Amino acid sequence: MYLSHLTMKNFRNYADVELDLSPGLTIFRGANAQGKSNLLEAIYLLALTKSARAHNERDVIRFEAAKQTPYTRIIGTALQKNNQQVEVRIDMAIAPRQDASTSGIYQKRIRVNGLPKPASQAVGAIAAVLFSADDLSLITGPPSYRRRYMDVLLSQVDKDYIKTLQRYLQVMAQRNQLLKRIREGKAGQD
């Protein structure tokens, strides 16, 4: 699989970009602060439906666009080994505020081949692996960093894995909550 086309509208520092990509190695080069990392972030967002860098996804909406119509659109078209195309489209917007005391409502819509999909079903439609300087913590950091990295990779490859992982995390949260209640004397051990 390779990404054959990328469209970005109001994403980070990009107002409107259309890129056609060829199979094989692609190198993006340029001066600092020109958007190379932003371009890679957009590709990663298409693969995993969430940003690798933004703590708040509202931050990916281009600042100038946020003043007018606060939205961003990223579309990626990938060509699979069997020559079938897959298109992932992610639209993010901030709805207008109801009054001056509230922030706008953030909305994210994901489509795969034109059909609306929840994030868990869109993960892996376009496969990507991002390795950055921050990922050195995979070597120096705790095992939880390595587990999370492997979870991200496996979620793209195996659709059932992400469902099982989500269920496992839910069960672990319930277990931890129950253990806390037992420790506090608010629940019995049976």
Language model regions located:
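Nucleotide-state sensing region of NTPase/ATPase domains
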Residues: 48-137, 143-145, 149-161
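Short amphipathic alpha-helical segments enriched in hydrophobics
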Residues: 43, 47-50, 179
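Short active-site-adjacent helix-start/loop capping segments
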Residues: 37, 138-139
